Amino acid sequence: MTEISILNDVQKIIVLDYGSQYNQLIARRIREFGVFSELKSHKITAQELREINPIGIVLSGGPNSVYADNAFGIDPEIFELGIPILGICYGMQLITHKLGGKVVPAGQAGNREYGQSTLHLRETSKLFSGTPQEQLVLMSHGDAVTEIPEGFHLVGDSNDCPYAAIENTEKNLYGIQFHPEVRHSVYGNDILKNFAISICGARGDWSMDNFIDMEIAKIRETVGDRKVLLGLSGGVDSSVVGVLLQKAIGDQLTCIFVDHGLLRKDEGDQVMGMLGGKFGLNIIRVDASKRFLDLLADVEDPEKKRKIIGNEFVYVFDDEASKLKGVDFLAQGTLYTDIIESGTETAQTIKSHHNVGGLPEDMQFELIEPLNTLFKDEVRALGIALGMPEEIVWRQPFPGPGLAIRVMGPITEEKLETVRESDAILREEIAKAGLDRDVWQYFTVNTGVRSVGVMGDGRTYDYTIAIRAITSIDGMTADFAQLPWDVLKKISTRIVNEVDHVNRIVYDITSKPPATVEWE
């Protein structure tokens, strides 16, 4: 069965991408209700949507103005498909603009709204069923609807937005000016669920088992009888990709585990034991540490580090592939959060990602990225559904560039060793405290900063290690973890006493945004 035929058997809601950094959160929330959802380009045609056969369509938010010359549009025939449509922020303005209403800069109609506002519901609506008449929502718009199209009526407003929710139930068209996909909209999940279940008629029966079936069909259709290389990093993502690919294509998969000298403590042996031994993956272990470290010598800029490592990874694969003969595909554990941070067709780039854009233009492989529509928590759920043990599935995330982006400034063996040893202590103490499932991600960073200290009767001038620990639901936003003081004290004491060339520990208390999870 092909991917298309499997998809035709699965109810789905399509999200059209108009450029918000958080668009995938819409699809993410809908999938939480047991409904398959994914992003498609706003350039999609009505005919293409007919072939996909969704039960609902969401028009996402975005940074543009609908009346601008370069505004992202929509095939007008989509409004005639008879499929329920929900417009969010820019999406609502687009519906209004295209169907005869009026959108103007917010200064001409009221005030711009950025942050939480109170939504006042003026009429009952299926979309808001089970939610209070007044509720906090996240607004983020510079334009406003001042006249709604014929056939629409007002459902809700805010103090500064005369049309915060509108609908045309006859045509199954709904618009909201706020963002239900973010947690700051207190009843946002209820609103999206009402759209998916009550309005679109979703059964809510999609699961990771469905995803596995679809991806296996897609992989088999793409690969055929050809061969695939997978680069194992030791992290959760590449491990899950390896097990999924083996399930799909068996011995057509060869895994290359590159020891680039930037791994965590004992990482290499653990990877070989877990995936090579327990799961029987065909793994070639390559010691390329000198090759990588020579190239990274004296490199300070994090983007250069990422590009060098991304390029060299592929060159190592190319060398190994030439020995294997006939390898056509390179598999990667790219997640959707990686793509968002690296920018999409409509969204801006925050930083290049180690699995996105770090590859040379003359790469000799086609890419396979089975996880690129998933968030981290979904990858863990996928691993469990594939029968993987919890010690692999709940392994701490590890970036492709390894410790290179956890060492600030030029990379040296001494700095790497401080991070390896301090990170091992951190992970051990977090587990002992029973916090390893509560804290989303945690690791240490060599800040590159030296400071004066006293050990015994002597003066020291050694490195400062930063501890980074965060809580999150999907990795798109995060808060610093409020670790117990006694746990932090024990971690700090152990690192300073057990790790050479370290005399100071600091704790990173920055959320995402404004910071990213990794320091580089």
Curated annotation (Swiss-Prot):
Pathway: Purine metabolism; GMP biosynthesis; GMP from XMP (L-Gln route): step 1/1. SUPFAM superfamilies: Adenine nucleotide alpha hydrolases-like, Class I glutamine amidotransferase-like, GMP synthetase C-terminal dimerisation domain. CDD domains: GATase1_GMP_Synthase (cd01742), GMP_synthase_C (cd01997). The active site is at residues 89, 179, 181. One of its GO terms (molecular function) is GMP synthase activity. ATP binds at residues 233-239. Residues 206-395 form the GMPS ATP-PPase domain. It holds the Pfam family NAD_synthase. Disulfide bonds: none annotated. It catalyses: XMP + L-glutamine + ATP + H2O = GMP + L-glutamate + AMP + diphosphate + 2 H(+). Residues 12-205 form the Glutamine amidotransferase type-1 domain. Its EC number is 6.3.5.2. Keywords: ATP-binding, Glutamine amidotransferase, GMP biosynthesis, Ligase, Nucleotide-binding, Purine biosynthesis. It is an enzyme of class 6 (ligase). Catalyzes the synthesis of GMP from XMP. Homodimer. This is GMP synthase [glutamine-hydrolyzing]. The lineage of its organism: Bacteria, Bacillati, Bacillota, Bacilli, Lactobacillales.
